[in-house]
Amino acid sequence: MKTVILLHLFFYCTIAMAKTISGVFTSFNSLTYTNTGNYPYGGPGYPTWTAVLGWSLDGTLASPGDTFTLVMPCVFKFITTQTSVDLTANGVKYATCTFHAGEDFTTFSSMSCVVNNGLSSNIRAFGTVRLPISFNVGGTGSSVNIQDSKCFTAGTNTVTFTDGDHKISTTVNFPKTPQSSSSLVYFARVIPSLDKLSSLVVASQCTAGYASGVLGFSATKDDVTIDCSTIHVGITNGLNSWNMPVSSESFSYTKTCTPNSFIITYENVPAGYRPFIDSYVKKSATATNGFNLNYTNIYNCMDGKKGNDPLIYFWTSYTNSDAGSNGAAVVVTTRTVTDSTTAITTLPFDPTVDKTKTIEVIEPIPTTTITTSYVGISTSLSTKTATIGGTATVVVDVPYHTTTTITSIWTGSATTSSTYTNPTDSIDTVVVQVPSPNPTVTTTQFWSGSVPTTETVTTGPQGTDSVIIKEPHNPTVTTTEFWSESFATTETVTNGPEGTDSVIVREPHNPTVTTTEFWSESFATTETVTNGPEGTDSVIVREPHNPTVTTTEFWSESFATTETITTGPLGTDSIVIHDPLEESSSSTAIESSDSNISSSAQESSSSVEQSLTSADETSSIVELSSSSDIPSSSIGLTSSESSTVSSYDSYSSSTSESSIASSYDSYWSSSIESSTLSSSDRYSSSISDTTSFWDSSSSDLESTSITWSSSIDAQSSHLVQSVSNSISTSQELSSSSSEESSTSATDALVSSDASSILSSDTSSYYPSSTISPSDDFPHTIAGESDSQSISFITSTVEISSDSVSLTSDPASSFDSSSSLNSDSSSSPSSDQSDILTSSSFSTLVVPSFSLSSSSSLSLTYPHYVNSTTYHASESESSSVASPSMASESANDDTHTLSESTDTTSSIGTDSSTVTFCRRDNGDGCIVTGMPSSSIDSEQTSDVTTTSSFVASSTPTSAEQSITDNPNIDSSQTSASSSTKLSVFVSDTVVNSISLSETSTLSSDDSTSSDTSISSTTNSDTGNINAGSSHTSTASIKESSIQKTGVMLSSSYLSTKLSSTSDITTELITTELTTTELTTIEDNEPNTFTSTPSSHSEIFSSDNSVLSKQVDGESTVEIPPVTDTTTVSSVSVHSIEASTATLGENSFSKVASAPVNTETSLRSTSSSSNHATESSGTVKSEASAEAIPSPPTSTDNRLSYSTEEAKGSTYANSGSTNNLMTESQVAAPTDSTSVLTANPVVTSTFDDKSSAAVNQPSKTKSIEESIGSLDSVNETNNGFIATLSQSEAPNSLIHSESISTTMAKTTDASINGDSAASNSQPTTLIQQVATSSYNQPLITTYAGSSSATKHPSWLLKFISVALFFFL
């Protein structure tokens, strides 16, 4: 009995002496990963991470039985079958640590350690311990896993363990999961203490939210059982770096759970959330190697996306350390104790007796602290205890004191405050002592602010304080009045604060400036413009234009000329026509009445025949005969016309016969009061010319017959209001044959634009001709047939016009046909060839439009040249072209202007060109073109334009037969309105140019055309037959233009174009015999869609820098060509030579160029389908680059230099490559074309300087080869084309003339055979350009269009059949 009592006493003494220590674990030496399960990557949740920790036990501080605990946050479990580890040194166990895995129960794992008897007071042991662990990165929707899912992120992390109040840590890099976070997420891990697995599945991501879905998993066999009592369902708003939910919220769903299946259905999950489920599952004893889970993932997203992604995944088996607990249930309980720490323990369990294993989580009683306050002098602390399961409360009551304040006045200079604390009571006393107050003085004064304010200035005790009231200055009312004195004066009346001051300005009367100008009315008027003080009043006297008297007189020269003598207002202008002394006959009949005058004139006809025989061996004869019959129009004007034909000598003889017949009827009425003219005109004419040329010699004979005929039928009606125009035209014609003629006409009434202009240039018949028809001006057609084909035309036009308002509905048609017969032989045995050429052309243009416009032409005065040209064209098939023009004056202070206009097929467009030149200091010109309806400038006057044209060409023989049968039908209605555009120029140089316009154009146009062209050519090497037909329709619904500072934007809503083509080509050469080609007609239309394009220009000037930038991009898709097959060879050689000479300073391409010009052009790659001359299908890719370099200046006049480099590459491809973009080269066929040009132009000129222009040769070569195309059964034997071109231009510029000589030689050869089938549509990306100048000019452009066409199945079938047939 005594022994038992002693043992109990020893036990209780030992318990009483044991204590809790800390700081045993001293360092975190390392944390490394070892892949122990063939995991895809080393994630923190995968086994095994090995932590190496340093420990130390000091016998003087620790005793056997003492305890210490290591807490490891975010550690999920220990990867070992051991339950504890010993801290051993030299084979001695100094402490034993037991593992407590957190798993799904706590957010941390821990080790509870007990010091063993091996430690004595004279021992200090230390060492390291290795712990195999895995971390918890989440995996279910429980609060423990949700909290631990936020412990770490991918990348560098700090892992910290705690031993009491001592912390040890290390850094580690955790890699991110490679699995996609947007797809189905599935996860499972073993819970060793429960001998179960937790299984998780997250639905695939729907960014816009889920409309509905089904999610779950099931067992494929009986190898696994689902614990339906542990299921969890939620939605999460995010996944961490390892695809684990970081939150869990409830939502509406329906669940179905059985031991073999766990499925939920859900609806209306908001965007940003994803459904997920988890549950415990238990592996059966038979599933030793693993088990399968079948995942269900069906979802319908809010944005219409749908998915059904089933998955079967095999999970390998995992064996835990509690293998002997088969059939026993595990219960997790929580017990609250009065200890201060949380612990996990497993109650004793005997599997042979007990049926339940109990894991007990021991938690301390929670405590909350409440702090209160009260009026008192001491602090109190009270504790409200609680039983286990409750919460204890600690109340801390903190005292505070109240205060009472006593204020008194004293003799000191400062304020003092003293606080007296009462140790026995809760009321303290504050004593405040303030000095006695000073007297105050108030003053009022003005200040610069806008509101009144008050400022107080205090001084020390026994002093005087000041109050300053600051008022804002009074408002001022200023009045200005005239007075009788000659000088200005100002009087100011001021008032006190809060009043109003007055300023009276007295000005003398303004001076007056009187100007006199012409106007369109028939009477004189005076207008007075007054301005305010210090201005200048204006008196404008407007006088009608002077009457003009025209006289004609003969003179001794052989050419005609016109002289105009103008006088000031109220005078009479004179026009003197000087004619050479020639034979003429005319008859004039005049009938007059009270209201109209009619006249008729019969022009005489004459013929001249001349023959000339030279002393050379070759004899040539010239016979010339012509007759004309031109009835004069019946119009309210007396007219006289004459025609003279003179003989001339020629180096080669020729015979020309021509007859001209025309009739012209005109009806018009005039009302002077309303200034309205209306007319209805009909004009028809026919011309037939026959010319024969022959030249006989001892060895060859050649005869040529040319027949040309045309007929014109036009109708138009005009309404003209407020017209006052005068035109004076003089023309001089000279040629090498020494024939000279002149024509002069003066007409006080000029008809308005008819908007249908028919013009033709028959330069092949007339070697040199100028045709400029216009309803606004007299028509002049000059032509000469000369064996040397050289002519000179000089004309002078003076124009003065006011506003025009017209409405017209013209209709016109034009028919022409021509034929050419030629027989030639060079020797009695040479070959003979016949050529027959005929053509016909008909045009019907029916536009209707309404136009209001006004224009004024400015004065040419010293230093500045300002010219404006206005024209309007409303015909789809019309073309208006004018040659280069230049103005010249004898006055040294007046400089020149060059201008060139070429307008073709414009619809509803008003165009004008404004040129400003400053020539006295070499600043160059600023040229701009813009749509406009009116131009106003500071000064207006007549403009004289002189044009000269010199052309030299060598006619070449041609052997061809061409038939052209076009038919064009168009209709158009449009209306336009626009504001005025103003141009402002100031100072002695062009400092600023302000351009502003707003225009709106609406139209409803439609145009259709039907064109048929066939051509036959016979030559010694073969014959070519070609034919084509074209049908097109176009419509433009609406177009709007808005412009500010020369900024333009326009849009075309729709454009449709359809075409058909039929081309048959046969080529026979001496080098290779070819077979006849057959081309299949493709009737499917092309569709083009245009997107809006924009154009903007911005001007800014600092008198030295001009910059311009142009960017453009367009996209066009074109249809493939039809299938063709050819075997061909082509050889071409041509030589061209031209010479041009322009008068002084009339060089249109150089004069208006700014100083120091730099232009950069870059063309991106392009691809398109097109037919070669051999009718093969070729898809090409091209890129070009041209870079003109900055010019260099050698004097203060003008210097211009340009360098250009170009490169082009073409790629040929088959039908499988239906889209080609920039920098792509198509396969399987290759085609290469290179164009290189490096011309350099340098021009420098002043009063006496000259410059030479040299350009290197330009060479272009094309080399194409076509291989076999895949998937289309194409055959190809290769196609090679070579084109070479060389240019050796030479230009010489003098101060008085510019001469340019151009020589060009072209050699081309094509040979080979090919067969190609239909290719698919491609995309063309065309040209991006950037330019910069050394003066202020910026231009941008952007646009795009696309087209798509697919070949018909019929064409594909026919092409395959044709391929096998050939």
Curated annotation (Swiss-Prot):
Compartments, record wording: Cell membrane; Secreted, Cell wall
Q: Which residues are glycosylated?
A: 294, 596, 866, 1273
The UniProt regions of compositional bias labelled Polar residues, in chain numbering, are: 959-969, 1022-1040, 1085-1107, 1192-1202, 1209-1218
Q: What is the effect of changing residue 907 to V?
A: In allele ALS6-2
List compositional bias (Low complexity) regions by residue number. Answer: 451-464, 758-775, 805-833, 875-889, 898-915, 940-958, 996-1021, 1121-1130, 1158-1177
List all disulphide bridges recorded for this chain. 74-151, 97-113, 206-301, 228-257
Task: Output the PTM entry.
Answer: The GPI-anchor is attached to the protein in the endoplasmic reticulum and serves to target the protein to the cell surface. There, the glucosamine-inositol phospholipid moiety is cleaved off and the GPI-modified mannoprotein is covalently attached via its lipidless GPI glycan remnant to the 1,6-beta-glucan of the outer cell wall layer.
Q: How does it sit in the membrane?
A: Lipid-anchor; GPI-anchor
SUPFAM superfamilies associated with the record: Bacterial adhesins (SSF49401)
Result for mutant: residue 1310 to M: In allele ALS6-2
GO biological process per UniProt: cell adhesion involved in multi-species biofilm formation; cell adhesion involved in single-species biofilm formation; cell-cell adhesion; hyphal growth; single-species biofilm formation on inanimate substrate
> Which keywords does the record carry?
Cell adhesion, Cell membrane, Cell wall, Disulfide bond, Glycoprotein, GPI-anchor, Lipoprotein, Membrane, Repeat, Secreted, Signal, Virulence
Q: Which parts of this protein are propeptide?
A: 1346-1366
What residue stretch is flagged as signal peptide?
A: 1-18
Q: Where is this region: Disordered?
A: 449-470, 583-658, 758-780, 804-833, 874-915, 928-976, 996-1040, 1081-1130, 1158-1218
What does the entry say induces or represses the expression of this protein? Highly expressed in biofilms and during candidiasis infection dissemination. Induced upon interaction with host macrophages.
Instruction: Identify the domain of life.
Output: Eukaryota
**ALS repeats mapped onto the chain:** 368-399, 404-435, 441-472, 477-508, 513-544, 549-580
Family affiliation: Belongs to the ALS family.
Which named protein is this? Answer: Agglutinin-like protein 6
The protein's organism comes out as Candida albicans (strain SC5314 / ATCC MYA-2876)
**Gene that codes for this?**
ALS6
